[in-house]
């Protein structure tokens, strides 16, 4: 491999991923995926555009119907991130367990507050379930968004998080 390619990979990948891919080191990563010192607080950048990404979880009403316990279920997450070139600034992460209508209101509200015109929602049955409610909410509020399907390529959640965010966090 060209040296430039190796250097570029070392600056964009997490150190664990780089060692695994380029040095054939298959150590386990104890102590968590992210290190506390990788998280940096800063003022909101002037430039950039907001992106909203949603990872839906079960909705409260359907959970009650199936007698599922709240404490064992995942939460819906709504990430509000400003992107300027290759820099990300996380404004907020809205998370919780809500009924499907309240979830739709929270998604639309987040997008309206930061004037984002599109929202990405992770593909799957839960995305399909919320779309009609989100469309109703957009119609009621007369606020329209482009709804983008976010695909995960069949990878496990922990792998997606590690590969997509770990290197970015480690290298700033």
PLM feature spans:
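Short beta-strand micro-motifs in enzyme catalytic cores
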Residues: 52, 76-77
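Short coil-to-beta strand junction motifs in C2/discoidin
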Residues: 70-76
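Generic structural signal for beta-strand residues in well-ordered domains
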Residues: 44-45, 71, 112
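Alpha-helix initiation and N-capping motif
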Residues: 2-6, 15-19, 75, 87, ...
């Amino acid at each position: 491999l060209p040296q430039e390619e190796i250097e570029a990979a070392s600056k964009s990948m997490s150190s664990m991923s780089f060692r695994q891919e380029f040095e054939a080191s298959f150590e386990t990563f104890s102590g968590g995926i992210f290190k506390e010192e990788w998280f940096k607080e800063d003022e909101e950048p002037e430039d950039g555009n907001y992106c909203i990404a949603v990872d839906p979880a079960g909705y409260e009403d359907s959970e009650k119907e199936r007698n599922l316990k709240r404490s064992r279920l995942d939460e819906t997450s709504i990430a509000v991130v400003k992107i300027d070139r290759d820099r990300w600034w996380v404004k907020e992460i809205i998370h919780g367990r809500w009924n499907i209508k309240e979830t739709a209101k929270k998604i639309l509200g987040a997008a309206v507050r930061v004037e984002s015109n599109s929202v990405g929602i992770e593909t799957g049955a839960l995305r399909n379930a919320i779309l009609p409610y989100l469309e109703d909410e957009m119609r009621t509020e007369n606020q329209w968004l482009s709804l983008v399907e976010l695909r995960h390529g069949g990878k496990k959640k922990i792998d997606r998080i590690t590969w997509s965010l770990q290197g970015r966090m480690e290298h700033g």
